[in-house]
């Protein structure tokens, strides 16, 4: 399998306090009937449209690289008008001397359940990814770049060809870190199963079929660090 994080150079709201060392702002997908609030809504909608387009372009290239009969088959999940995608802003305040060591973990080890994540941050380090041997490496920050993180759903769609990237956020700087993630997800009733082109006699179906709604319910019933895609793996095949 391939575990991948790509760095790219580029050109309603609910506030949830998850812990004293991380705060986040969630923005749900755009709904026409929701009142749009001036410059903020315009800026967010423009940003979401841009990163959504970027994500779809990347997934189309993935489809071409995998020689899928329809290179848009994965990106169509995100283009769907009922896509469950959303935008999140994370704020990691710099720790103070009295904070316990556990506060150095801004967000614990996990993989994202969605298809992929488009991440951008300021110039403060903190993002780390887990290598196949279990070691952790820091991802150098670059505020002029987007980072593309493979999620569990893409792992299932590609029958394990691409693997969800386990990552975490470390609060180790004397400066505040901020990041923005666009989580690209299918509609709740979108049916996820290994694409036929990714299945062969030597690589049988390795994941059970599920809807995105079913996966969300199963995934969020487990602890953050749990390998949640394992719930749908066919162990004899993967």
Model-predicted regions and their roles:
Residues 1-238:
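Peripheral, non-catalytic segments flanking oxidoreductase cores
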């Amino acid at each position: 399998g391939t575990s991948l994080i790509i760095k790219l150079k580029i050109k309603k709201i609910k506030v949830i306090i998850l812990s004293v060392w991380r705060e986040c702002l969630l923005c749900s997908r755009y709904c026409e009937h929701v009142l749009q609030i001036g410059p903020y809504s315009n800026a967010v909608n423009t940003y979401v449209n841009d990163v959504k387009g970027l994500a779809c372009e990347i997934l189309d290239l993935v489809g071409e690289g995998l020689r899928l009969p329809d290179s848009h088959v994965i990106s169509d999940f995100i283009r769907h008008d009922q896509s469950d995608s959303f935008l999140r802003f994370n704020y990691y305040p710099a720790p103070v001397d009295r904070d316990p060591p556990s506060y150095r973990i801004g967000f614990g080890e996990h993989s994202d359940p969605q298809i992929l994540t488009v991440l951008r941050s300021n110039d403060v380090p903190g993002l780390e990814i887990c290598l196949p041997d279990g070691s952790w490496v820091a991802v150098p920050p670059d505020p002029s770049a987007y980072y593309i993180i493979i999620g569990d759903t893409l792992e299932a769609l590609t029958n394990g060809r691409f693997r969800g990237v386990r990552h975490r956020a470390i609060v180790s700087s004397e400066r505040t870190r901020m990041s923005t993630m666009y989580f690209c997800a299918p509609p709740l009733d979108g049916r996820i199963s290994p694409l036929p082109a990714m299945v062969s006699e030597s690589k049988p179906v390795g994941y059970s079929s599920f809807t995105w709604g079913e996966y969300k319910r199963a995934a969020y019933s487990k602890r953050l660090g749990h390998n949640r895609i394992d719930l749908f793996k066919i162990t004899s095949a993967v």
